[in-house]
From Swiss-Prot:
Post-translational modification: Phosphorylation by PKA activates the channel.
Location of this chain's protein in the cell: Cell membrane; Perikaryon; Postsynaptic density membrane; Cell projection, Dendrite
Bridged cysteine pairs (disulfide): C133-C149
Domain note: Each of the four internal repeats contains five hydrophobic transmembrane segments (S1, S2, S3, S5, S6) and one positively charged transmembrane segment (S4). S4 segments probably represent the voltage-sensor and are characterized by a series of positively charged amino acids at every third position. Binding of intracellular calcium through the EF-hand motif inhibits the opening of the channel.
InterPro entries named among the record's database cross-references: Ion_trans_dom, VDCC_alpha-1_subunit, VDCCAlpha1, Volt_channel_dom_sf
Source organism per UniProt: Gallus gallus
Functional note: Pore-forming, alpha-1C subunit of the voltage-gated calcium channel that gives rise to L-type calcium currents. Mediates influx of calcium ions into the cytoplasm, and thereby triggers calcium release from the sarcoplasm. Plays an important role in excitation-contraction coupling in the heart. Required for normal heart development and normal regulation of heart rhythm. Required for normal contraction of smooth muscle cells in blood vessels and in the intestine. Essential for normal blood pressure regulation via its role in the contraction of arterial smooth muscle cells.
TM ranges: 27-45, 64-84, 154-177
Activity regulation statement: Inhibited by dihydropyridines (DHP), such as isradipine. Channel activity is regulated by Ca(2+) and calmodulin.
Residue span of motif Selectivity filter of repeat IV: 116-119
Subunit note: Component of a calcium channel complex consisting of a pore-forming alpha subunit (CACNA1C) and ancillary beta, gamma and delta subunits. The channel complex contains alpha, beta, gamma and delta subunits in a 1:1:1:1 ratio, i.e. it contains only one of each type of subunit. CACNA1C channel activity is modulated by ancillary subunits, such as CACNB2, CACNB3, CACNA2D1 and CACNA2D4.
Name of the protein described by the UniProt record: Voltage-dependent L-type calcium channel subunit alpha-1C
Pfam name, any one: Ion_trans
Length: 177
């Protein structure tokens, strides 16, 4: 009964002091009664309390899964920058100005696109050998006219990344929640 009376007093004071900017009565104390109604509801239901407790406990393991995902993206982005960072940008392929391994943020964004399953096969095919190199990435004293970029490592790289994201990471994330 005390919680209901406190809530009614809170609503009444809020309505009365709504027009006044400088109210003398601090109504923050009465707002605690609204929270107490929720606590009272949770204390009655054993199932709701168990569900809430499980939900809170699962959030304790969530940062570790997030850290694992960040580490996976970081490692694969650095490897991708080293192996595929010199591929020339071409708007007709999947390696273009929006999707490339030339900078770290672009590499992470490209990996996020692959992790969601959006055209990762085409990106993999665009990173295979015999692709043109970016003219800005070649050394000035390079004499090779047919210098090609890309690597056969792309097949292992993209399939392993997709498998880790699709099966291991997503399953861990769902298992924690």
């Amino acid at each position: 009964a005390l919680i209901v009376v406190g809530s009614i007093v809170d609503i009444a004071i809020t309505e009365v002091n709504n027009a006044e900017e400088n109210s003398r009565i601090s109504i923050t104390f009465f707002r605690l009664f609204r929270v107490m109604r929720l606590v009272k509801l949770l204390s009655r239901g054993e199932g709701i309390r168990t569900l809430l407790w499980t939900f809170i406990k699962s959030f304790q393991a969530l940062p570790y899964v997030a850290l694992l995902i960040v580490m996976l993206f970081f490692i694969y982005a650095v490897i991708g920058m080293q192996v595929f960072g010199k591929i020339a940008l071409n708007d007709t392929t999947e390696i273009n100005r929006n999707n490339n391994f030339q900078t770290f943020p672009q590499a992470v964004l490209l990996l996020f696109r692959c992790a969601t399953g959006e055209a990762w096969q085409e990106i993999m095919l665009a990173c295979l050998p015999d692709k043109k190199c970016d003219p800005d990435s070649e050394p000035a004293n390079s004499t090779e006219a047919d210098h090609s970029c890309g690597s056969s490592f792309a097949v292992f790289y993209f399939i392993s990344f997709y498998m880790l994201c699709a099966f291991l990471i997503i399953d861990l994330f769902v298992a924690v929640i």
